[in-house]
Amino acid sequence: MNKTRVSIYTLAALATLGVVGCGEEPKPQPPAAPPPPPSIEIKIGHVAPLTGGIAHLGKDNENGARLAIDEANAANIQIEGKQAKFVLVAEDDQGDPKVGTTVAQKLVDAKVAGVVGHLNSGTSIPASTIYSGANIPMISGSATNPLLTEQGLKGVFRTVGRDDQQGPAIANYLVANNKPKLVAIVDDATAYGEGLANEVEKTLKAAGVKVLPREKGTDKTSDWKAVLTKLKGRRPDAVFYGGMDATGGPMLKQARELAIKAVFTFGDGACTDKMKELAGDAADGLLCSQAGIPPQAADKKFLEAYKKKFNVDPILYSPFTYDGTRLLIEAMKKANSPDPAKYLPELQKIEYTGASGKISFDDKGDRKDAEMTIFTMKEGKLAPIAIIKGGLTISFDDFVKASEPAPAPAAAPAAAPAAEPAKAAEAPKAEAPKADAAKK
């Protein structure tokens, strides 16, 4: 009896355990997300004057580089199997060659992987020797003096044209359209201003135009009355100034106050809308050149992104510093390394289409097939009027039309569905033609 009860209780307990054991199994948990890849910080330097008379141009250049950095970080680029985090190290060289070399060494010590800059030729040329000596590539988006790439230094590039392209462009345009017989030339005694003025003078003399003895200022001159009074007595048909807008604007304003009626022409450093701010109504009708396509012709995506991020339009060379930054990053991607020794060969042979068009470099580091643009000031705004490339001049409007992608061909209309064949039973019987009809 007791054994029977024990057996019953044992079976009941086992049954209970069985019910529990056969209950619903726990749901499988989703696999844990893989850990994010390790990151790698890659520093890219940018240098331009962020204080002083041309700080607006320096900030414009920096904005272009910063936009490229932000876009690259948003793209989740992986290099060496690691998540790349690009950091822009922005420095102010004040447009001063001595400060420029100090800043260059600072970037070398910070172990930047590459440099975009400097803005001025006068700072870019001495700084380039420091970067090249440290095997750090530099790409200037605005330094136009030929000496930058004629030094034969390794790893030095530019995304704009050279002054020995820009000088002839503005001089030949002036000769062809204004036909001056006597031209005065003034420069600001910088590597950029003097170098560009030299190219203009050579071209004018080769065209048979008489050129007055050179007049000089500095990159800080604000009172030009002594120089202009001397020029007024010589009655030139045109005046070319090699310098920046911060000094070119006051020169032009003072010239008109002295009733000098000559056509005033400028290079890219003074080819900005700020000339209107500095010279007032005297700016209308000026001629100037830029060593590349104008900002208005830059890639639309770049223009929209720039305006959205900075709430202003590009001023001058920000499309070119944007491209310079992207070129460094693209070369690193191709080499799968931020090590300059590994990515420099990729940079030298790169072919890239960016905000300023198609870019590739020659053996010196110059941009191949660089365009030059001629502007005039109209109603307070710079207006591009001509593009010069390979010695050929075309109107800006024609250049824009030629650059627009051809419209996609219209899709062929869909074929009408085939008529359903009539069923044999429903097909009408054709009448035999009458004899008279057959004779007709």
Positions of PLM-derived features:
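Extracytosolic ligand-binding ectodomains
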Residues: 2-5, 9-14, 22-440
